């Protein structure tokens, strides 16, 4: 009995060689449509066009090709049901043994900057998903392939099984098929929700693996890196120029570093941030990038060992030389100058990456909890002082405003309870992750030491009591920036006035857990 294969693909990678082997090695008869049939015929492979197979022409400009009983009957027929076989015979329908379908490139289409809604709509596949789902449903009786990477394993299984495909193989292909259509529909729903400015009580998440990581946060935890969308973006689009394979912890720290450097546009002062365990240990700005890095390093040279460095400008030779003076895990910047690349290459295990757009972060963040997950808008608004309020008698100078803004940008990216002490565009002390705010204040001030005299202090949350203000003043802090919003704000304001401090309320809290 002849075997029939239905081929209709958008991704034509490996198509001709695969189809030729089906025909020459395994005596398949191929039914195909549109561009797939055209390519196979041009390659000299015998093909029956879908219109010939069904006896019905393509209509509506190709919108209706495969939606026909002779196609779907051949896919959905159960070989072990007499009534199904009788229906096939009565309607002269040939059952398919193999269906090879992948879908219109919707995600690649919407990734184009100039795409219109009409363009996107035309790339919503109808017949393809119908064939994929029907084939996956009936995997007990046929095989569905949705990715060119499956072609060689299928041919191997066919040869090893003397023409029979094992059920386990068909099951895996069916699962991949349903994942394929689910991801496709999720991409469409997400895009249309954005276009229609609509909200929904359902959330579709779709992702594909980029890399299986060596392990997660700890060696006993398995981990995989996924990207959203068919087109690589964010870290999936970054270029790793050298060094060891990225780890789970590297990626987590790199993302935190990206978020900090996104606060400092490349057309402003040079900026450098050094992170350890998802927290900044040194952040600095300067005219020269090498100076910004050195100041960030000197801010906490002990913690910088084994750290992650993010820079807002192309790495030059001077900065590269400075960074080779200590052990670092990763460096990321918009680009690397050739002379700098030669210098960094001496550190073979050092991971060096370029990321074209530091503002390419997600619009929402997702966190797993038992039985589900939480979704929130990303805290990625660029900070300005426009809506800030001076709440003390003492007023900030023009220079103070710049330093208050710098400190506020930094503390936003420190784990709560978060305190940052800064001066002249450099962090002097950072208190992170303490269970009480005054505890973080004390840690930051202890790190700053004598340098706290005349410095700025930023807090990611309000002060519940005036103890933090008094502790800061005793160390020499001259200005504080915080969200405000405590029931006891008046106590903190009174303490600041009593001690001659400037205090500014931003009106925005930046908890980070």
UniProtKB/Swiss-Prot annotation:
Recorded GO CC terms: cytosol
Record-linked SMART domains: AICARFT_IMPCHas (SM00798), MGS (SM00851)
Keyword Hydrolase: yes
Its EC number(s): 2.1.2.3, 3.5.4.10
Domain of life: Bacteria
MGS-like domain segment(s): 1-146
Keywords, ordered alphabetically: Hydrolase, Multifunctional enzyme, Purine biosynthesis, Transferase
SUPFAM superfamilies: Cytidine deaminase-like, Methylglyoxal synthase-like
InterPro entries assigned to the protein according to its UniProt record, in alphabetical order: AICAR_Tfase_dup_dom_sf (IPR024051), Cytidine_deaminase-like (IPR016193), MGS-like_dom (IPR011607), MGS-like_dom_sf (IPR036914), PurH-like (IPR002695)
UniProt GO molecular function: IMP cyclohydrolase activity; phosphoribosylaminoimidazolecarboxamide formyltransferase activity
Disulfide bonds: none
A single GO BP: 'de novo' IMP biosynthetic process
Enzymatic reactions: (6R)-10-formyltetrahydrofolate + 5-amino-1-(5-phospho-beta-D-ribosyl)imidazole-4-carboxamide = 5-formamido-1-(5-phospho-D-ribosyl)imidazole-4-carboxamide + (6S)-5,6,7,8-tetrahydrofolate; IMP + H2O = 5-formamido-1-(5-phospho-D-ribosyl)imidazole-4-carboxamide
Pathway assigned to this chain's UniProt record: Purine metabolism; IMP biosynthesis via de novo pathway; 5-formamido-1-(5-phospho-D-ribosyl)imidazole-4-carboxamide from 5-amino-1-(5-phospho-D-ribosyl)imidazole-4-carboxamide (10-formyl THF route): step 1/1; Purine metabolism; IMP biosynthesis via de novo pathway; IMP from 5-formamido-1-(5-phospho-D-ribosyl)imidazole-4-carboxamide: step 1/1
Domain note: The IMP cyclohydrolase activity resides in the N-terminal region.
Family: Belongs to the PurH family.
Protein name: Bifunctional purine biosynthesis protein PurH
Species whose genome carries this gene: Synechococcus elongatus (strain ATCC 33912 / PCC 7942 / FACHB-805)
Gene it is expressed from: purH
